Amino acid sequence: MFTSPGPVLFQFGPLTLRWYGLLIAMAVLIGLNLSSRLAQSRKLENGLISDLLPLLVLFSVIGARLYYVAFEWHNYANQPIKALAIWEGGIAIHGALIAGTLTLILFCRWRSQPFLDVLDVLAPSVALGQAIGRWGNFFNSEAFGVPTDLAWKLFIPYANRPVIYADAEFFHPTFLYESIWNLLLFVLLLVLFRWGSRERQNFPAGTLSCVYLIGYSLGRIWIEGLRIDPLCVGALPPACEGGVRIAQLMSAMLMVLGGLGLWWLKRRQQQLPVSTNR
C-alpha cells in the first residue's frame, strides 16, 4: 500500500520546497547529463544540449500548462489568473511534447543542427524524465486511477477524492504504472541507441524518436483508461462516459505518427546510395 507524505518537502518561512519541483529539477539535471553524453557519441556540436535544455524545459512547461488549461477552461473562466498557478498542479505531457518539438525545430534551424539526430539524443532522457516526474503525482495525491483493493493500492485523502468516490479510500496508483512503463521504455531506447550507433546504415536518424512515440503511446492508452481525472471532450470526468479521453486520442495519433515515421525512414534509407548511408 502507498500513502503520500504530502506535496511539501519542507517549508522555512515564505520558502516552500515541493516534491514535484524537486523531482522536475532532478529529471532536468539527469537529462542534461545523459543527453550530453549521447550527443558526444553522435558527434553533435559541443555544448549543444546545455544551450538547448533551458529553452526546451521552459517552453515545454508553458506548453504543458496551456494545453491543460485549454481543456479545463471551465475551471479557470471565472478566475483566469489561476491559470498561472502551475504549482497547484495541472500540466499535460502531450502539451509539453508539442511545445518541446516546436522549440527544438526552431533551435535546430537556428544552430544549423540535424533535427532528427538531436531528437534521438533527447528521446531516452524524455522517457527517464517522465518516469521520475510521475512520482510528483504521488506526492500531490493526483492523477490516480479507479478504486481498487490490490496489494499495491494507493491511499488518497478524503479532500483529494472525487465526490462520486468519496467513500473509497484506495485507488490504482497509475503514477506507478506509468513510471515503470517509462523506465522500461528508457532502457529499451538506451539499448537501441547503443545498437544504432554501431549500425547506422540500418538505423537512420529519427528511428529512436519514432520508437518512443509508439512505446509511450501504447502505455498511455492503457493507463489513461484507468484514470478518473482525464481531460475529456463530450463528457465530464471522472466517468467521461460517452466522451473522448483526450490523452488516449492524442496517444493513438502519435502512435500512428510513429509507425508512419518508421516506414518513411526505412523507405528513404533504402533509396539512398550505399556510399551515402550514415
From Swiss-Prot:
Catalyzes the transfer of the diacylglyceryl group from phosphatidylglycerol to the sulfhydryl group of the N-terminal cysteine of a prolipoprotein, the first step in the formation of mature lipoproteins. GO terms for biological process: lipoprotein biosynthetic process. It holds the Pfam family LGT. Its main location: membrane. It is found in: Cell inner membrane. This is Phosphatidylglycerol--prolipoprotein diacylglyceryl transferase. The chain crosses the membrane at residues 12-32, 44-64, 86-106, 113-133, 173-193, 203-223, 246-266. It comes from Parasynechococcus marenigrum (strain WH8102). One of its GO terms (molecular function) is phosphatidylglycerol-prolipoprotein diacylglyceryl transferase activity. Keywords: Cell inner membrane, Cell membrane, Membrane, Transferase, Transmembrane, Transmembrane helix. The gene is lgt. It is an enzyme of class 2 (transferase). InterPro entries: Lgt. Its EC number is 2.5.1.145. NCBIfam families: lgt (TIGR00544). The keyword Transferase applies. GO terms for cellular component: plasma membrane. It is a multi-pass membrane protein. Belongs to the Lgt family. It comes from the Bacteria. The keyword Cell membrane applies. Pathway: Protein modification; lipoprotein biosynthesis (diacylglyceryl transfer).
